[in-house]
Amino acid sequence: MKYPIGIQSFDQIIEGNWVYVDKTDLVYRLVTTTKTCFLSRPRRFGKSLLVSTLDAYFKGRKELFDGLMIAKLEKDWHQYPVFKIDFNGVNFTEKGNLEATIEYYLANWEKIYGETPREVPMGKRFEQILSLVYQQTGRRAVVLVDEYDKPILDALDTPLEDANREILKAFYSTFKGADEYLRFVLLTGVTKFSQVSVFSGFNQPKDISMDNHYEALCGVTQVELEHYFAEPIANLAEKFNYTVEEMKDVLKMQYDGYHFGSGLLGVYNPFSLLNAFDMNDIRDYWFASGTPTYLIKLLRHNHEQMDELTGRYYDPSMFVDYKADVEKPLPMIYQSGYLTIKEYDSRRNRYLLDFPNNEVKKGFLTMVAANYFKPQEFEVSNWIVDAVILLEEGETTAFCSALTSFLADIPYDSHGSIKTVEATEKHFQYTFYLILRLLGVYCQLHVEKTQSRGRVDCVLETKDYVYIFEFKLDGTAAEALQQIEDKGYATPYQTDTRKVTAIGVSFSSETMTVEEWEEKTL
């Protein structure tokens, strides 16, 4: 079985006999019910392949679709002039690159369809080209724009951001003036910018990003997983000595969990899934493929906010449109694929957002922790794995020593301007939020969503042990231990056959590390 990793060309996949998950019934629905539309999906989720599929369809390449669902639906197979704009592969942090890229496309089209006046704006030139095409062919044009937002994302939080936005706004205004010459328009990207920015120059495209009809347009559903990939699932199960059903559960926890609408149809990350099958191994493929620069920039502006974003209900207006505000990172984090919809409250029209799966949870929290604590990401990741091993083996003293050393190694400047009591409490709570959530990737974690000032409590469960922690700021370990008993945190585990240990930890605001700890077997 051949997996098309990195291949975004529909014709190459079909002609090369690579695995193709048939989405053409959704493609047919899209092109027959919509004229101008926009789709937001995370990076490496199949947007470019979708654009390539539409390109082949509108060029009437019927032979490529033999045996696919659309072959039974489409009867006419008309050929349309297709204008494909791909902003991938260009660095838009340098002034002039966006204008040069658009000029490249316009010049090539003018070679085919005829010259247009150079003194008019780029958007008007494109409109003239579309008019010429209609006059010459008698057919309306198809425009496909892949990664429409990359010129803005590349320049996020720089002076060039506004300049690139204005250029795109003027260029995309073409679609309003040239409406009579257009058969179909699709813009894909990661982020939907607010309606007053890029899209304000032309008729609003239909946003299908959260349309339940197109939840599975990109990615792999559970039904598709079992239909197309039974063989590689069996291979993985054999390697890890799992049953096939157990292996499916592992894949679901690691790569599934995306939901793109109120229908809550689960979608697997296709990039990670294909890599796992190709390598016959479970790794963090999507996250390892790179962290977008724009996300790193957002994290620099938002530290303590991150623990407030997950596991909460939101009105869709709070995460659908990005307003280029680094102080409000939720839309960018959601649309980039680091958070996803987990539940839908239809009565109040609210969505619960959280991490989609273990790969993203581990990778995102590690990245945030490295950005906050300042060590390298691999150092955070290695420490977490070592700490989990100690907990799994019941080595509580070694774990507390490792925790003390980790906190002591955090550079002083990473504490920022922690000079007030409020800032110290915030640093204390956020520090342990990150550490506990990372441990929770490997252990079962129960942590209070709302913590009292100056304390954090949680329960970590492994196969053989249950640990009840109370972290106290500028208190004593004995007081923390007493808090565990007073609150009755161990009561649910009275009949548990695992060893239950209460651990009280005191955190010093002066040294910014563990001052003392005490433990008690319950």
What do the PLM-derived regions correspond to, one by one?
Residues 142, 465-467, 501:
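Structural motif
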Residues 1-423, 439-442:
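Phosphate-binding site recognition
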Residues 492, 498-522:
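Domain-level recognition of nuclease-like catalytic cores that cleave nucleotide substrates
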Residues 162-168, 473-490:
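Mg2+/Mn2+-dependent nuclease catalytic core
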Residues 171-178, 331-339, 431-438, 484-503:
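Metal-dependent nuclease catalytic cores in nucleic-acid-processing enzymes
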Residues 432, 456-473, 487:
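Conserved catalytic cores of phosphodiester-cleaving nucleases, focusing on short active-site segments
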Residues 425-428:
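Charge-enriched interaction surfaces
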Residues 133-137, 439-463:
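Active-site metal-binding core of divalent-cation-utilizing nuclease and nuclease-like domains
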